[in-house]
């Protein structure tokens, strides 16, 4: 990209064996003696992304460098590969790549880099075999010839301020512990999802208790342990469970939480992948333009979106454009957005289906799909014939959504 060409650390021209090569790596923010164990992540990746998006960042881009961690179809000899990369200006890969022959050696390097000054922020080590498959068969997340070994997660003892209950998109009651806010690595943590009511009761968490909190994948806080409990227990009574996987497709006052959870899900990457739309935006849209059902936003006009508090004219136009683009998503994405209980392994076999074909399937036909047993087949038939789901399918048909 044009912005990448402004980064001084990136060579403008590659010659020799590197000419026309594809390199894989990551931009990083140069640090002076960064000790991961002490300083944590420092939100470094977000800072890099911010610099790459700034219009006036030409000078600041000199703070960036690149770590090349793969050269598909490059020289098979690792020493020669690292030498060629270093000659081209990619010095860090060679400095931080070492041969190992045992898990003990891997552990030693991991501990050393975790506790020693480095010129960048890191979150673990990559262990890879000496040989790699041809580049044409590489697939993200599916390389059996390499593995990541993350550093121990940062953790803190944090006190519980309150316990509250929320309803997820499946209708299940979730327990959230509100915490005294603290910095954990590069994040400000003030709440943690405990999980189901049964898990909360098993952990016996009350107001005033102290929890060991760490960051799981993607920086999500998690409860590792209860380290101290108050002598006098303060635990609220959970509300009665009155929602399920087929409730709250339509908005009502008592459905507000599950309805919002459904909106958050359908806009996520796992469903319709609506760019730039999340929980906060759904809240303000629902307050300004109350939606009847989970797909009512498709009928919003540019003017209605621009009238939402906090949304500028330009952003309103952009949102309307994103909503309009979603109309072209494949049929399977729409039924996922509705919450169809299909196992991941069976999705590929539904890509050529439409709503009428799905609704016509019997329990016996559903059981022929991977991962679908007697209970799941019964759930699928119930889902496809539920009056609210049928009404949504009819509405989407009126909107000319593919497959309906």
Model-identified regions with their sequence ranges:
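Extended, well-ordered alpha-helical scaffold/bundle regions in very large, multi-domain proteins
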Residues: 357-365
